[in-house]
């Protein structure tokens, strides 16, 4: 099990990203628009830099929904390899069968 504080910190980051996504996209569009004057683009760059670091999507860590484990998490199921193996062996994941040859 991951520390509750680590899981909560990641959840807080997800909320911040969701709240600031529109503003970030608007500022990035201004920065990328070469037809705008350089001063306006520079001002947008400064506003983007002033935003909280945790409002950036790259700060979010994929964590297991079951255990909170940060490593070896499959995006499709949002579960770690350990949780998938555990649930699969109990027959709780439809279509998942243990491989043998």
UniProtKB/Swiss-Prot annotation:
Record's compositionally biased regions (Basic residues): 12-22
Any one GO MF annotation of this record: rRNA binding
TM stretches of this protein: none
SUPFAM superfamilies listed in its UniProt record: Glucocorticoid receptor-like (DNA-binding domain)
Keywords from the named record: Ribonucleoprotein, Ribosomal protein, RNA-binding, rRNA-binding
Renumbered residue ranges of the record's region Disordered: 1-22
Any one of the GO CC terms: cytoplasm
Domain of life of the organism encoding this protein: Bacteria
Gene Ontology BP term (one): translation
Task performed by this protein: Binds 16S rRNA, required for the assembly of 30S particles and may also be responsible for determining the conformation of the 16S rRNA at the A site.
Similarity-based family: Belongs to the universal ribosomal protein uS14 family.
Subunit structure: Part of the 30S ribosomal subunit. Contacts proteins S3 and S10.
PANTHER family xref list: 30S RIBOSOMAL PROTEIN S14, SMALL RIBOSOMAL SUBUNIT PROTEIN US14M
Name used for this protein in its record: Small ribosomal subunit protein uS14
Gene from which the chain derives: rpsN
């Amino acid at each position: 099990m991951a520390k509750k504080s680590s899981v909560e910190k990641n959840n807080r980051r997800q909320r911040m990203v969701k709240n600031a996504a529109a503003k970030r996209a608007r500022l990035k569009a201004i920065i990328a628009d070469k037809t705008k004057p350089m001063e306006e683009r520079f001002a947008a760059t400064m506003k983007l830099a002033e935003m909280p670091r945790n409002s950036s999507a790259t700060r979010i860590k994929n964590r297991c929904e079951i255990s909170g484990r940060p490593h070896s998490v499959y995006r499709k199921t949002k579960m770690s390899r350990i949780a998938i193996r555990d649930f699969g062996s109990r027959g709780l994941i439809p279509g998942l069968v243990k491989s043998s040859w």
